[in-house]
Amino acid sequence: MAGTVTVPSASVPSTPLLKDELDIVIPTIRNLDFLEMWRPFFQPYHLIIVQDGDPTKTIRVPEGFDYELYNRNDINRILGPKASCISFKDSACRCFGYMVSKKKYVFTIDDDCFVAKDPSGKDINALEQHIKNLLSPSTPFFFNTLYDPYREGADFVRGYPFSLREGAKTAVSHGLWLNIPDYDAPTQMVKPRERNSRYVDAVMTVPKGTLFPMCGMNLAFDRDLIGPAMYFGLMGDGQPIGRYDDMWAGWCMKVICDHLSLGVKTGLPYIWHSKASNPFVNLKKEYKGIFWQEDIIPFFQNATIPKECDTVQKCYLSLAEQVREKLGKIDPYFVKLADAMVTWIEAWDELNPSTAAVENGKAK
């Protein structure tokens, strides 16, 4: 007699990937009602909420989520004088959450980012895709024309060196956005009604030696591999620049990943970016950066890190010194930023003493 095969119901939830190894970091100034939409995907995970702005304001978090919430008073209490390296009145404050996390992986998302749908109409579990990206290797040393060769249905194309097919460890997964594009203020002004409706089903590795503008609103990374480099700089209140926090972190991170032979992926997953920020306010924040970036980009393109720098911390301190020496000639702000970069590493090592001497990759 044939046995009966029981097929599990589709409604039975699968075990969340890395449930005990990943923190979700959210910077905010408002109630987190947007979490209701993300509940099916986020509820099993621990949240770190970094409250920006007025610390006396109460932030409402929907019931049922496991979270810690830190405001400016908490940041000052925990870091003391070193709290000066954490931005105020700017989403760059999120990096405090990276510092206090004790998990191997971090996913960060903005509070105006909703669940997107794929072309079939299915809700996209952005976190699951980020985890897939981080757990599979990257290909920074040779470009594969089928993009990610480790995805189901893909492979290395003819002519791809067999010696490089093992790939490199993936440090960062950079996701994209439907609806409101991540444009700078001048582009926002000339294209106020533009919306991104193109869903490109692809994940690719950013090649070694290539920089890119990292966006922090849909981003995941391996904290053990690259965490100390994910400093979002000095932005916002009291600073001459804003809206360059995630890009600054991305440029520093990419130079260090290249040095340590680590990989960075971009593409899937998509989120739905619901709200356009004010382009006139953005222009005031970005104004100096629009000019400065013409010097900042060549600086990072030409930056070299000594081979003896075999940890992220050593690499980052080397970059900080170069920022002080070279970009400091452009504006005194960069001397202040370089000091903050050093303070950030000191604070990171105080809160994470076991990671201070860990080799993160292989220096090239």
Curated annotation (Swiss-Prot):
Q: How is it modified after translation?
A: Reversibly glycosylated in vitro at Arg-158 by UDP-glucose. Reversibly glycosylated by UDP-xylose and UDP-galactose.
Q: Which reaction does it catalyse?
A: UDP-beta-L-arabinofuranose = UDP-beta-L-arabinopyranose
Where is this gene product found?
Golgi apparatus
Any idea of its EC number? Answer: 5.4.99.30
Q: In the UniProt record, which residues carry a glycan?
A: R158
Q: Enumerate the Pfam families for this protein.
A: RGP
Task: Give the result of R151A, as annotated.
Answer: No effect on the activity
Q: Where is this site: Required for activity?
A: R158, R165
Mention one GO molecular function. Answer: UDP-arabinopyranose mutase activity
Q: Fetch the InterPro entries from UniProt.
A: Nucleotide-diphossugar_trans, RGP, RGP_fam
| Subunit relationships | Heteromers with UAM2 and UAM3.
Q: What job does the chain carry out? A: UDP-L-arabinose mutase involved in the biosynthesis of cell wall non-cellulosic polysaccharides. Catalyzes the interconvertion of UDP-L-arabinopyranose (UDP-Arap) and UDP-L-arabinofuranose (UDP-Araf). Preferentially catalyzes the formation of UDP-Arap from UDP-Araf. At thermodynamic equilibrium in vitro the ratio of the pyranose form over the furanose form is 90:10. Is probably active as heteromer in vivo.
Q: Which PANTHER family match?
A: UDP-ARABINOPYRANOSE MUTASE 1 (PTHR31682:SF46), UDP-ARABINOSE MUTASE (PTHR31682)
Q: Domain remarks in the entry?
A: The conserved DXD motif is involved in enzyme activity.
- What is the protein named? UDP-arabinopyranose mutase 1
Organism from which the protein derives? Oryza sativa subsp. japonica
List the gene name: UAM1
